[in-house]
Every structure is written in structure tokens, then in C-alpha cells.
Amino acid sequence: MAATELRGVVGPGPAAIAALGGGGAGPPVVGGGGGRGDAGPGSGAASGTVVAAAAGGPGPGAGGVAAAGPAPAPPTGGSGGSGAGGSGSAREGWLFKWTNYIKGYQRRWFVLSNGLLSYYRSKAEMRHTCRGTINLATANITVEDSCNFIISNGGAQTYHLKASSEVERQRWVTALELAKAKAVKMLAESDESGDEESVSQTDKTELQNTLRTLSSKVEDLSTCNDLIAKHGTALQRSLSELESLKLPAESNEKIKQVNERATLFRITSNAMINACRDFLMLAQTHSKKWQKSLQYERDQRIRLEETLEQLAKQHNHLERAFRGATVLPANTPGNVGSGKDQCCSGKGDMSDEDDENEFFDAPEIITMPENLGHKRTGSNISGASSDISLDEQYKHQLEETKKEKRTRIPYKPNYSLNLWSIMKNCIGKELSKIPMPVNFNEPLSMLQRLTEDLEYHELLDRAAKCENSLEQLCYVAAFTVSSYSTTVFRTSKPFNPLLGETFELDRLEENGYRSLCEQVSHHPPAAAHHAESKNGWTLRQEIKITSKFRGKYLSIMPLGTIHCIFHATGHHYTWKKVTTTVHNIIVGKLWIDQSGEIDIVNHKTGDKCNLKFVPYSYFSRDVARKVTGEVTDPSGKVHFALLGTWDEKMECFKVQPVIGENGGDARQRGHEAEESRVMLWKRNPLPKNAENMYYFSELALTLNAWESGTAPTDSRLRPDQRLMENGRWDEANAEKQRLEEKQRLSRKKREAEAMKATEDGTPYDPYKALWFERKKDPVTKELTHIYRGEYWECKEKQDWSSCPDIF
């Protein structure tokens, strides 16, 4: 029987759920709308009676009296699992899942919890391996026949399931429907804006009003309890007195029936009164405990905030004392620059009073090495030839076709902001869900920051011309490291893109490549990126940014795989990003570090490169921001060693085998011959007055420059970002709130459409990206967004009719 048919018989409410979960030997028989409900055999009797009471009220006789008795025990799920119970939000047990045409249906252990349905091959497997999970908030549940049902999210996940019996199937379907309703409700209550609402004073006032209302209702319930008992006793006494009077036989019969019904009413009322009394006692007892616990937690939070603030100040004093007592290298985060440069910073050291108001300012002093241009070397890493370097004719053509780009933006205003008042509520939270004013931002979106990975695109141009795959891998590794060079002083936060926001960068004439980014998901925030070059390479990635504030530092973890494909050879490289850490969030000078390892793999040849980003330490004698690496062939033999820093340069050395005592190669790796040293990459100098322009590089300064013909969803057209770039921060904050509210309304509209489609039993397509398609990657087998094409064709025709209105 379909779920809709079952709901029509029993009617809504917990009684129906209890009947479905009844643990008797047979299914409970649902009583008619008029009265008596006869239960099925076994302990299902109690459930059958409760359903009868819910459907039409107690009937005469024992059936009606039973309804006032104790409630049935919580039901147990079929096949040895726990049932949906009263909440219908958790269940586990065995079901048969369709696998393929060879194996057919296979027995699997299913677990329903928190709106997610997961399955395992066995119950023991729950500890370590989940075979699949589907989110019920966006899923459709369809009943096929007495035992079979289907769960599908309209995408790649569809479960064809079979229960052992119709009753067991219905228990699962009911539990799934309830879990789905709860998941959809929770989703509707979540904040779409990417900036989760913090607990404001208005929220606290509303919470206190709610508590007062609840207390008032509990008192009303207590009063009604006493009134029911009082009037019930008076009614019974009046009926008894009426029965003792001498009246005609017909009247006596009627009075007797009324008395019987009054007796049943008294029994039912007494049961309700007892339940109310127990609830009141329990609520009053626990209310006092909860109030004490709440007050205790409030006091603890205040003490924790005060302690943390004090520790942060002490830490800042210790750092200053350490810097004063120790001479650090010029390139450490704590001492960037020389005394000669301090006059150019525009401000001196902040006082202790200013520390707690310190904002995401980048380091104040910076030493720019002389002649820090991007130097090109030959493609042959041994240094013998220069096949890969651009010839003079090509350089001349580039200079002629190069468009004039802007070289400056309005200087950053000096607005003060109490950072601690905001950040103390963010400890341990995902920062993409915390509302932040634009004071924390730089006037670029995350899509534009992602495009900055292409700043040193010529490394891929050189790699595309390499004939040796191991040499090619060295240039790919240098390109990977170069993408972090723009972060060294960039301590401000980019704008969170709106869902559907895009950013294009067309440098086909000047540099031979063009790039497109699109925000394909909002929670979790994810951006897809595709860049293609006429010089023989394609770069694509989908990056999800997760971040956590730990009190003293902020961790930013990019999740996702980056792909680089070279057209001529078919070499396909993949790698992932390392963790970025922002230190001294509360007080002290902010500084950024990169740490972790990157494994770059050539999926065609099996060559690998392992890069290690060494975390900075005040007490280490190592070079700050150090990166080391090795390039190996499929057998594990090391051919090249890489050395450098992620903020300045990368070099490589050809590894020569050392002759062992017995004449053989020792460990197949040897000294790094000085004559084989090749400079793979060196950072370009920052523009003049970069410290006043958010430390933007030459490329970053051009990214938000207005261009004609872009899509209406392009980041350059985002009004709050443009206002911030122009120094109108108050207006930018107001505009940011408007855009977030508009996005929130769009999300609620989609959810309402999904809910209606679910109620109507019609399929609903969830949100899909416009220019990217989510599918399984042929190399990594991961689900990712891959460019579907048509963007540049639409731009040429200026046909943007399919673009959403997000600004």
C-alpha cells in the first residue's frame, strides 16, 4: 500500500506512527472512523486501540476503556533494527538493495539518521566503511509495490530497495518521510547567505520572551488541570444524585447510559490529569536545573572570553619581547623589512590599547628585493638549450598586442574596527557562515583570487614544450608553488561569491589563455574553474573552501583536485592545495603561512613530485616559507630535487647517483650538482605603493577593472565589491546585506518549489550550475564540476538570456 494510501486510512499524528511501528505478531488492524478498533494478534493490540481512539474516539465497551490505558511501548524496527519511534528521525535495519543484473538484490545494513540514509555491507562495517549516503532533504521516495520502494535525489544516486514484508516496507517509508520532512525544515531554517546570523540582542530578547510565554502556558496548564479535576468530581456527584431520584424507567435507562459515558470520561480525564501532573512536576523540576546550568554556562563563557583576551595580550607582549631580544632574518614574518624602510610604512608600532582593535591589516613593513623580475631559462633543465623560452619575435608580438591595463586602484581607507567584538563569537565555527563587514575584505571575490593562480601561466607554456616528462613535471611543480606567492601579504578576506556568480579573464591576445570561474555551490561554498591556452594546455579545478577560527589563528583548508592537461602529449597531472594559516588574529601583526604536502601525479607516465611546505617557526634556523621537493619516476628513482620558498623562487637540481663502496649506485640518488641548478620561477616585484592597495600584484590590480561584454553575473558588476574598492565602505556594507537577503529569498523559493514537487509526487531538479556540469571525473573518479562549454560563444553573440539575476 502506498504511503499516501496509508495516511488516508489512519489519519495524521503520532498515533498513526505508533501503529506502524507496532511490534506484534501481525500488523495492527485500523479501526473505522466511528468507534471500536480491534487490534491484530499479539502485542499489536495496544497499537490498534490507540489508532481507533485517534480515528474516531473511544467506542463503548472494553475497546473504549483501553484507549485510556497506558501508551504502548516504543515500536521496534523490522529485521532487528531500531524503529522510527516517536520522532521518526532514526532507524536502522536490513534491507535488500538492487546492485546489478548479475547479483540482483543484495542484503545491506541501512542506517537512517539526521536526514541521511547510509548503507553498509554489514552492521560491523559501520565503524570504518560507508558504502553510500543519500541526503533525504532533496530526495524523492516512491513506493513501487507491497515490498519495493525507490529513493532518488534526481541525480547520480538512486536506491532500489526491497523490504521483507509490506509492514516492514511501510515502517521504513514512514520513517523516511518523517526524516525527510525534518531535514527539509532544518534546511529551510538554515541561512543561505553564506553568513550565518549571530545571536544578536534582538534574538536574545525574543528568546527571553519565548521562555516567559512557555512559563505562562505551563501555569495555565496547571490551572486547567485543577479545574478539570474539580468540575469532573462535581459532574459525577450530580449524576449520582440524579440517578437516586425516582424517575420513569425510560429516563432511568437514559441516565444510566449518561452515567456510563461520564464514567468513561472520568477514566480518560484522570489519565490525562495524571499525565499532565507528571509533566508539570518534571518540567518544574528540570526548569530550575536548566536555569542554573544556563547561568553557569553564561558565567563560564564570560570568564573564557576574558581569559582568552588576556592570554592574547600576553602572547603579543612575549612576541615583542622576543623580537627585541633576538635578531631575526629579514624575511621572517615577525620582522619583514629593515629599519630604513620604516619611514615608508606610514605608521609606527601600535600601542597596547590599539591592539584589541587591530584589524586584518597586512604587515606594515616590507623589503622588496632588487631586480626581482620573472627570469626565464631554457626548457632543458640541465641548462644546455633554450627551446622553451619565448624567442625575441614572439616577445615583440606580445608587447605590441598587449592591452594597457590599470596599474593602481583607490588606496585602502584607514577604518578602525573592534576585531575582538566580532571574532570572539566565531571560535570553532565555519567562517563562511559568519556575517562579516566588508572591513575584513579586499575588493576581489574568491573567483578572482582563484584566477590569480594563472599569474605565472608562462610556466605552463614552457612545460607544454618540454619533451621530457620529468622536466615537464618540474615546471608544473614550480607553477603549483607560484600560486601561493600572492598570499604572502594578502591577509584580507575575499568576498564570498553569490550562487551563480561568474568571473571571466580573457587574455587570449596578450598571453594566449582565457579563464572562466563560476560559483557552483553555496553551502558548502564551491567554485569551478576552467582555463585553456592556445599554447597547449588546459587547467581545471573545483575548490571548496572550509575555514575554522581557532582563537589564535585561522585555518583555511581548500578541498578539491586541480587538473592540468597538456594537449600534445596527453600528460594529465593532478594535485591538491595545502592548508593556509593566518596567525595573530586577535592581536599582533597578522602573517600567513602555508604548510603541508602536495603530491603531483602524471597519470599517463606514473611520474610523481612530492612538495613539502615547511611550517614557519620562530625557533627554527631554516629559511622562512621553505619548500622542498623531489621528482621521481614510476620506480621511485629520484631524478630532480626542488628547493626554494613559496613567496620568492623555486630552483631545481639534477640528481646524480652516488657510486657506492661496491661500485653500485647508493640509494639511486646523490649530490645536487651545483652546475645543474636551474631557476624555474622567481616572483615578480609588487607594484609601487602596493601596501596601500591591499598588496595586490600587477595581475590582481587588473582583475576588477570594468570590461564591456561580460556576463551580467560577472564579479566586476557586483555592487558591494565595487563600492568597497572605491572606498565607500558604509554603502558597501548596506549593499552586501541587500544582496545576501536577495540570495536568501531565492533559496527559500527553490525550497518551496522542491517541497511542492515532493507533495505532488513530481520530480524536481535541484539547482544546477550554468556553465559547468557535475559528473564523475574520468581520471580521479570524483564527482566534480567540468566546463560544459558555450560561455565564449554566448559572449560573442551577447546572448545572456540564461543568466540568473543575482545582483
UniProtKB/Swiss-Prot annotation:
Its main location: cytoplasm. 25-hydroxycholesterol binds at Q314. GO terms for cellular component: cell junction; cytoplasm; cytosol; endoplasmic reticulum membrane; Golgi apparatus; Golgi membrane; membrane; nucleolus. InterPro entries: OSBP_sf, Oxysterol-bd, Oxysterol-bd_CS, PH-like_dom_sf, PH_domain. Ergosterol binds at Q314. One of its GO terms (molecular function) is protein domain specific binding. Widely expressed. The keyword NAD does not apply. Cholesterol binds at Q314. Residues 88-181 form the PH domain. Residues 291-326, 730-760 form a coiled coil. Residues 77-86 have a biased composition (Gly residues). SMART domains: PH. The modification Phosphoserine is found at S190, S193, S198, S238, S240, S338, S345, S351, S379, S382, S385, S386, S389. Changing R108L: Impaired lipid exchange activity. Induces a shift in subcellular location to the endoplasmic reticulum. 7beta-hydroxycholesterol binds at Q314. The modification Phosphothreonine is found at T377. Keywords: Acetylation, Coiled coil, Cytoplasm, Endoplasmic reticulum, Golgi apparatus, Lipid transport, Lipid-binding, Membrane, Phosphoprotein, Transport. A 1,2-diacyl-sn-glycero-3-phospho-(1D-myo-inositol 4-phosphate) binds at L117, S118, Y119, Y120, R121, S122, K493, P494, F495, N496, H522, H523. 20-hydroxycholesterol binds at Q314. Residues 61-86, 329-353, 710-759 are annotated as: Disordered. A motif (FFAT) lies at residues 358-364. Lipid transporter involved in lipid countertransport between the Golgi complex and membranes of the endoplasmic reticulum: specifically exchanges sterol with phosphatidylinositol 4-phosphate (PI4P), delivering sterol to the Golgi in exchange for PI4P, which is degraded by the SAC1/SACM1L phosphatase in the endoplasmic reticulum. Binds cholesterol and a range of oxysterols including 25-hydroxycholesterol. Cholesterol binding promotes the formation of a complex with PP2A and a tyrosine phosphatase which dephosphorylates ERK1/2, whereas 25-hydroxycholesterol causes its disassembly. Homodimer or homotrimer. Interacts (via FFAT motif) with VAPA. Interacts (via C-terminus) with RELCH (via the third HEAT repeat). Found in a complex composed of RELCH, OSBP1 and RAB11A. The FFAT motif is required for interaction with VATA and proper localization of the protein. The PH and the Ala/Gly-rich domains control cholesterol binding without affecting 25-hydroxycholesterol binding. This is Oxysterol-binding protein 1. It comes from Homo sapiens (Human).
